[in-house]
Every structure is written in structure tokens, then in C-alpha cells.
């Protein structure tokens, strides 16, 4: 059974005019390695423990502005057009049927959660019913692009939407023109130079100041309460992390003053957002968040998240390898081949930008391999190769082919071959939507453990967004989790805790 909404009644939950307050008992474990006489030496001891947390969620949903870096790209035009189509209730003719606008592919808008059972039947509700979230139809879009093409023409260039839909969207989008963007040809492929007719001039510091000015003016012009900025621009090459340049907050800010060339455009946008305490999310694989930038975000308590949208091939990989290792099967070789024909593929044809993507795609299985010391010796890892080629004809319809070779019982071999046609921007757009909505929501949640005196926000390095990214950014010293099921459970269970609901553990003891 599916229900649209619910309210929690519990002595541990209180609804006020502007807040939901909950008391949550977090059951976890503590491990110690102790010398035990009864065991004849050192032994691992696991001690269950319960920590009480208090959560406060501000239920006042703001008017949200979203500024995209690379607004005129395939992702930006697809997301903007998709939200307009949903807001206006647009339908259009395909070769098969009359299609209605929807938010399929969005975790927050199109997935469900289990809330319990009734008369022996499982009861589910929308994910978005857990806590008050911004309605995507109400989001105001803006942003920057190194191309001055309006969003209607950018949509036509992208060749993602059906022609009938494009015609209906054009009047809404032709007046939308991106602000000039930061352009540094040293960080992206040379083939992007032909698009760069809309750029911010000046020193690195002047560029950051211009972005700050743009954010303030966008917020004032559109009368929005909050702004979230997300990078959906070109993949950049990796920045060199150098002692004295960008290794600390002080050195990074000094490098900005000195106009150091190794400060990337994405890092410049992030600097501007942190100075304005605006959430910034990196949707590409480069190392935008150099150590000095992370230091600054932590000091300013300004939300940052990333890296790289997890939409197609990598999402499948994080599910399949988790299944194999969890089943006691040993993946020994993973070969992933992609070809695509959009501008992302064109930019990735340069070796230095491809390397950023290769790192992001390759690290996705690390935590799953490390979790099973029966299958893998220390330091052992599957052979893992990622190939990306640019084929203009296929456009935004990316092809992903994977071969997984695994060792099974008694030296046997199992091979799984998968072909995945990924409509790149149609998969990425709802993920962008989820990222900005969840980033905004997380800024309204505060918590404290029982031994703490004051409420505080989540750590500014937003691990809560991990489900949506290939290479999750985590606070220093925090384990990286890539397994998709664990990431979704973490996100859902944190939001459940905010309304005093137990984590979904699937035990269903009442029927055992």
C-alpha cells in the first residue's frame, strides 16, 4: 500500500510551529583490542553501545535559487527545461505516445520509503514525505557559462529532448542567458576554446569577487531566500597540490592574492561560495577541493559536497561489485569501456581531463574490496581499467560496456558482460536536482549528542550527499563508502532519525 504522507506520534518527537524535534537512540559498536588472560593473548572485543542524539529540523521551506556553473551545457539546459515542463504540466508527442513531464530518476521526487505495515501489508510513502523539502517546481535557475548561448538554443544544441517538447519549452527558455564564466584553457581541453565567448576577465581574485557579486545580485533580483551553487561544467585536469600553494587555508588565500596559475576555475567558484556561506557542490571528477579549500570550508562552516555525478555505469558498478563481494564471489578483473558524443565526451578526449574521470571511476570499488579479507589479501585489488572514447554520432546517448571476471568455487571463473545505454543528461539532471534539494535541506538540520551542550549543523563536508556522487567527499579521517545500498540507507536513516523513526533494518521481527 502506498500513502502520500504521515505524521509521527511518539514521546521522542515534538512538532512545533517551525521545527520538528526528535530524540534518537543511536545503536552502534565500539571495538577494542585487549590482552585477555582467559583468551591467552590479545583479542578483539566488540562492545554494543547506545548514544542519544537530539535533532532539530527547521520546517520553513525557503524559496530556493540554484546557480549552475555550465548552465548552458547539456545537463544545465536539460534540468532547467525539465523543471519548467513539470511546473507547466507540459505533455508532448513521441513516436510511441503522449508523454507527461515527470521527475523519474530523482531519489527525492520519485522514490519511496517503507514506513511500516498495516494488516499484514507493507506501507510505503514518498521519500520526500520524510521531511519538508523544496518543491522543485518552485526553484529559480541561473548560472554561468563560458558560452553566451541562450538556454533555448543550448537545449537545441544538446539534442536531448524530443522536438515537440523543445518547441513548447523555447518561449520559456530563450530569454535565459548565462552570466560570463571563468575560463582557463590550461585546465580543460583545447577543443573547448571555440565555445569560450562569454568569459570573466581579470586576476583570480577579481574573478572570485565577480562571482560573489553575481550571487548577491541573483539572490536580490529573484528574491530567493537561499542559493545553492553546483558545478556541472567541463571536467578539469587535476590541480597540483603543492606545499605553500594550496595545502592550507592561509596558503590558498595567499595564492589567490598572488594570482597563482594553479588555482582552477572550479576552486575559484568554490572560494566565492564559501566566502558567502553558500553551499557548493562539485559535479565533476577533478580535485576542486584542494586541502586548503576544505580547511576554509570547515572554518567557515560552509557546506561543500562532491565529487562527480553518479548516474550510469558507475552506479551499476557500485551495485554489482557490492553484490559479488557480499556473496563471497571474488571479482578479479573489471574492464569498463565508454563512448559518447556530447561535449563532455569531446572535453574528455584530452588526456589530462580523462585522467580526472579515470580516477573517479576507478576508485568506486575500493571499500567493497577492503571489506572482505577472506577474498583479498592485504594490498590485493582487482585489475580495473576504464576507457572513454569520443564518438560524435551517438551524442548524449552514452554507451557503456563492462566485463566483470570473478573467481568462484574451487577455482572456477564467472564472467558477467553488461551493455548499458545511458542517456547521459536525462540521468544526470534528476541527480543534480537531488543534490541541491538535499544540500538545502541539510542546512536546516541541527543535532547534538547527549554529552554536547549546543546544537550544531552537520559537518560542512557533506557526506549525506554520497549516494549521488562517484567519489564521495568526506571529512578527514572518515571512511569512504561507495556501496550504493549502504549510501542510500545512510541517507534515508538520517532523515528517519530527524522524525524519530528507527532505521530501516529489514528484520521484520514481528513476522518471524
Curated annotation (Swiss-Prot):
Q: Where in the cell is it found?
A: Cytoplasm, Cytosol; Nucleus
Record's superkingdom?
A: Eukaryota
Provide the reaction this enzyme catalyses: D-glucose 6-phosphate = 1D-myo-inositol 3-phosphate
Please tell me whether the keyword 4Fe-4S is annotated for this protein.
no
BP GO annotations: inositol biosynthetic process; phospholipid biosynthetic process
Q: Which residues bind NAD(+)?
A: 72-75, 145, 182, 192, 195, 232-235, 283-284, 308, 311, 342-344, 357, 395-396, 424-425
Kindly state which keywords UniProt assigns to this record, in alphabetical order: Cytoplasm, Inositol biosynthesis, Isomerase, Lipid biosynthesis, Lipid metabolism, NAD, Nucleus, Phospholipid biosynthesis, Phospholipid metabolism
Matching entries from SUPFAM superfamilies are given as:
Glyceraldehyde-3-phosphate dehydrogenase-like, C-terminal domain, NAD(P)-binding Rossmann-fold domains
- Tell me yes or no: is Isomerase among this UniProt entry's keywords: yes
The molecular function terms of the Gene Ontology recorded here are: inositol-3-phosphate synthase activity
- Cofactor(s) the record lists: NAD(+)
Q: Which Pfam families match?
A: Inos-1-P_synth, NAD_binding_5
One of the record's GO cellular component terms: cytosol
Pathway-wise, it operates in:
Polyol metabolism; myo-inositol biosynthesis; myo-inositol from D-glucose 6-phosphate: step 1/2
**Record-listed E.C. numbers:** 5.5.1.4
Where is it chiefly localized? cytoplasm
What exactly does this protein do? Answer: Key enzyme in myo-inositol biosynthesis pathway that catalyzes the conversion of glucose 6-phosphate to 1-myo-inositol 1-phosphate in a NAD-dependent manner.
Q: Which family does it belong to?
A: Belongs to the myo-inositol 1-phosphate synthase family.
Q: What is this protein called?
A: Inositol-3-phosphate synthase
Question: Which organism is this protein's natural source?
Answer: Mesembryanthemum crystallinum
Lineage, please?
A: Eukaryota, Viridiplantae, Streptophyta, Embryophyta, Tracheophyta
Amino acid at each position: 500500500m502506498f500513502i502520500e504522507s504521515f505524521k509521527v506520534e511518539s514521546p521522542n518527537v515534538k512538532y512545533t510551529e517551525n521545527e520538528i524535534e526528535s530524540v534518537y537512540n543511536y545503536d552502534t559498536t565500539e571495538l577494542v583490542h585487549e590482552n585477555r588472560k582467559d583468551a591467552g593473548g590479545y583479542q578483539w572485543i566488540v562492545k554494543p553501545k547506545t548514544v542519544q542524539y537530539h535533532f532539530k529540523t527547521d520546517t520553513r521551506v525557503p524559496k530556493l535559487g540554484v546557480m549552475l556553473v555550465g548552465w548552458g551545457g547539456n545537463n544545465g539546459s536539460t534540468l532547467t527545461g525539465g523543471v519548467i515542463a513539470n511546473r507547466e504540466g507540459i505533455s508532448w508527442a513521441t513516436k510511441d505516445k503522449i508523454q507527461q513531464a515527470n521527475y523519474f530518476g530523482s531519489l527525492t521526487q520519485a522514490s519511496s520509503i517503507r514506513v511500516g505495515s498495516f494488516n499484514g501489508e507493507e506501507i510505503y510513502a514518498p521519500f520526500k514525505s520524510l521531511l519538508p523539502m523544496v518543491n522543485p517546481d518552485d526553484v529559480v535557475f541561473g548560472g554561468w557559462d563560458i558560452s553566451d548561448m541562450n538556454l533555448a538554443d543550448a537545449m537545441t544544441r544538446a539534442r536531448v529532448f524530443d522536438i515537440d517538447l523543445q518547441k513548447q519549452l523555447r518561449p520559456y527558455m530563450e530569454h535565459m542567458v548565462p552570466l560570463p564564466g571563468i575560463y582557463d584553457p590550461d585546465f580543460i581541453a583545447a577543443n573547448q576554446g571555440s565555445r569560450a565567448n562569454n568569459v570573466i576577465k581579470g586576476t583570480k581574485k577579481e574573478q572570485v569577487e565577480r562571482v560573489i557579486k553575481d550571487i548577491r545580485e541573483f539572490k536580490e533580483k529573484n528574491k530567493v531566500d537561499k542559493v545553492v551553487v553546483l558545478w556541472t561544467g567541463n571536467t578539469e585536469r587535476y590541480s597540483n597540490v603543492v606545499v605553500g600553494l594550496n595545502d592550507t587555508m592561509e596558503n590558498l588565500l595567499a595564492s589567490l592574492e598572488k594570482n597563482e596559475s594553479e588555482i582552477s576555475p572550479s576552486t575559484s567558484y568554490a572560494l566565492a561560495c564559501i566566502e558567502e556561506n553558500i553551499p557548493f557542490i562539485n559535479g565533476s571528477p577533478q580535485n576542486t577541493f584542494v586541502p586548503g579549500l576544505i580547511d576554509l570550508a570547515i572554518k567557515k562552516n560552509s557546506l561543500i559536497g562532491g565529487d562527480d555525478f553518479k548516474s550510469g555505469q558507475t552506479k551499476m558498478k557500485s551495485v554489482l561489485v557490492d553484490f559479488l563481494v557480499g556473496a563471497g564471489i571474488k571479482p578479479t578483473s573489471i574492464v569498463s569501456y565508454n563512448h559518447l558524443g556530447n561535449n563532455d565526451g569531446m572535453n574528455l578526449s584530452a588526456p589530462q581531463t580523462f585522467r580526472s574521470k579515470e580516477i573517479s571511476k576507478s576508485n568506486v570499488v575500493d571499500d567493497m574490496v577492503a571489506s572482505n579479507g577472506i577474498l583479498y589479501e592485504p594490498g590485493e585489488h582487482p585489475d580495473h581499467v576504464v576507457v572513454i572514447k569520443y564518438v560524435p554520432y551517438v551524442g548524449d546517448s552514452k554507451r557503456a560496456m563492462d566485463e566483470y571476471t570473478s573467481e568462484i568455487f574451487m577455482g572456477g571463473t564467472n564472467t558477467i558482460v553488461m551493455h548499458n545505454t545511458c542517456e547521459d543528461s536525462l540521468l544526470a539532471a534528476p541527480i543534480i536536482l537531488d543534490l541541491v534539494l538535499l544540500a538545502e535541506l541539510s542546512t536546516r538540520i541541527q543535532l547534538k549528542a547527549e554529552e554536547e551542550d549546543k546544537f550544531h549543523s552537520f559537518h560542512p563536508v557533506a557526506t549525506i550527499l554520497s549516494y549521488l556522487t562517484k567519489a564521495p567527499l568526506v571529512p578527514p579521517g572518515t571512511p569512504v563508502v561507495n556501496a550504493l545500498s549502504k549510501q542510500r540507507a545512510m541517507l534515508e536513516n538520517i532523515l528517519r532519525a530527524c522524525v524519530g523513526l528507527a532505521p530501516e533494518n529489514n528484520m521484520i521481527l514481528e513476522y518471524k
